[in-house]
Amino acid sequence: MRLVEIGALSADSDLVLWEASCETISHQISLKLARKEGGLMEIFNSVVASLPRKSDSFRFSAISSKTSWESAHRNLLENLTKTVPVLLENGWKKSPDFQKNSLIDLFSLLEDEDATRIFKMTQESRSITEDDVEDYFSMFDKKFDRLLTYGAPQFENCVRDSPMRQKYANLCVEVLVAVGASVKNAQKITDFLEKQSMKVSKIWMTRIPEIFEKITNFYDYPMMFDVAMALDGFPLRKVFLARRFALQSILEVFIEMAPNTKYKVRERVRQELEKASRFVGYASEMGHDNLLSSFSPKIVSSIEDSKHILEVETIERLRRCGYLENLGAPLDELVRAQIASIREILPHFSAEFVHLALRHFSYDSEVTLASLLSRENLPLELLRLENVELRAGIGSGEWPPLDFTASDEIEKLARADKRAKDEETRKNNETKSASNLFSLAPILSDRPPSPPVDQQAELRAHAEAYRTSVLTKLQKIRADAAGPSSPSEKIAVDAENLVPLATSKKYSALNSLKISEADKVAIRPTYNKYRYETPNDGGNGVYDDEYDDEFDGREFNIERLNQELETSSEEDEAGSSAPPGLSQPPPYQGSRGGRGGRGARGGNRGGAPSADGYTGGHDRQMKEKHKSDIKQRGADRKKRGVY
C-alpha cells in the first residue's frame, strides 16, 4: 500500500485523507514487525519517497497547522525507523525491492541522532558505500533536467479552455516547490555524510546559477498571473510564494556550500560566477559581494553588469504595470503633500522614489516613512532602485499590478463557496438516503441559520474588479503573443514614435514575403511583358545567344547615314590594331575536351544573320513549346522496342 500524497496547495479534505493513510500504514508496519512478515521493503520505499520533509515548507506547514496531522506524521516516521534494523539484519541487498537510493534519502527525513545511529548500522553491514553515494548524487544532478521539463512547457502549450489547464497549473507550483525542497534535502544529506567522514561530490551545486536563470525565465511575471488564474480561487500569493521559495532556497544553499568547495568544483563555480546573470545580481543584493569576489577578481565586473540587468528589468516591469505614470508629480494634492513632508525629513530621496514607495505601501505616509528609515520592510525592488534616476513615463498598463489583498479575498470567497456546495451536497445525499429506525447521522438543527452580516462588501467588490482586470489583461497578453504584431504599430516613448523591430528571423522573413492578391494582379502584366524574348521586342542590342559564354571585345562602330559599310577585312585590320595591353580573348574551342568530330558542333555559335533580316535572339516561345519533343520521340522508340 502506498502513502497518499498531498499537494503543495492542498485543501483540508486532502490532509484528512492523508492522515488516514498515515495511520493505516503505521498499523500495517506494526503488524508486520510483530508477526515478522515480509513486504516491509516495498512500504519503506514508497513512504520515504512521498513523506513530506521539513525542508518542504509548503507541505510541512500545512501538516503542522493541526495537532492530529503532526502526530500522524511523527508516528509514521517512528515506525519507519524501526523497520531499518530488521531490513539490514535480513539482508538489505537480497530483497527484490531493494533501492539503495531510498536508504540514503532517509537521512533527509531523520534528525541527526537517529540518522547517526542508522548510518553506523549501514556501515557495519556495508549497505552504503562511497560508490553508492556517488551514484545517488549523479541521479540527483539529472533530476534537475527532468524537473524543469515539466510544468511551464505543458502549461504554455495547453489550450485555454482545456480541462488539463488546471492540472498543468498545479504542476507548475509543484515543480517550483520541488526544486527548492530537493536542493535543501541534498544539502542536508551532504552535510551529514561529511560529518560521518564519507567522501561526497558537490558537483551538483555548480548548476545552481543555471537553474536559477531557467526558473526566472520560465516563470516570469505574466506567467505567475496566468497560473494563478487557472487555479481554483486565484491563489496569487501562494503562487508567488512558491516561486520565491524555489529561488531563495537554491540561493541560500549555494551561499552556504560555496566557501567549502575545492579543486574541480570550485573552478566550475568560478566560471559560472564570471558570467553576468540574475543569480549574481540577486546574490550581490543579498550582501554576498565578498563571497562572490573571493572566487576571482573578474567577478566584480560581473556583479556590476548583473545589477544593471536587474535594474533595467525592474523599471520595465514597473512601466508595464503602470507604476511609473505621473511618478513624482501626482495629480492629487494630498499625495503631493505626503511626498513633500517625507522629503523634508529624508531629503536625499528623490520625489520619484518617495512616490513609488508610497504607492507600494498604499499611500500610508507613516508606514512609508518608517520603512524608509529602517529599510528592513522595504522590498528588494525598491532597494534596487534607490540609487537609480527614475523618470515619469507613460504606463502601458498591459500587465496587471500585484494586489495580494484582493487575491486573498478572492481565494477566501472561493473556499466559502466550496464549503457551501459540499454542505448542500451532503444534505441532499442524506435526504435521498433511506431513513432507518436508528440513524448514526449527527443531529442537525432545524432552525435556519441567521444571515451573515456582510461587513466586507467593498473589499469583495474590489477583489472581483481586480480579478476581472487581471483576466482582461492576461487575455490581451495572450492575443499579442499568439499573433504577430503589425509592422505599422508604433509605441510612444519619450515623445518619439518607435516602430518595433521583428526579433525573429523566421517570422520577419515570412512577413516580408507576404503579398496580397491585389498586388499580384497589379504586377502580372509587367511580369508577362518581360517573360519571353520575341523578335518584335526591338531589343537589337541584346546578345543573340544566352548559352554562349564567349566575350566579344570588339568596339561598336557608329556609321553615318548614306555611307558604305566597311568590309570584313577592314574590320579585322581594325580589330588587330587594338591598343597595346588589351589582349583579345581566344575563340571558343569546343565543349569540355570534345569527342572527335563532334567538337565542331560545339564550336563558336555566333553565325551570320538570317536571310530574312531577323537579327534578334531565338524565338523563346517556340523553344518552350517544342523543348520536350526529343523526350517524346525517345519514348515512342522505346515503346516500339527499338531500345
From Swiss-Prot:
Residues 591-606 have a biased composition (Gly residues). InterPro entries: ASCC2, ASCC2_CUE, UBA-like_sf. GO terms for biological process: regulation of DNA-templated transcription. Residues 561-643 are annotated as: Disordered. Residues 617-635 have a biased composition (Basic and acidic residues). It comes from the Eukaryota. This is Uncharacterized protein C06E1.9. It comes from Caenorhabditis elegans. The lineage of its organism: Eukaryota, Metazoa, Ecdysozoa, Nematoda, Chromadorea.
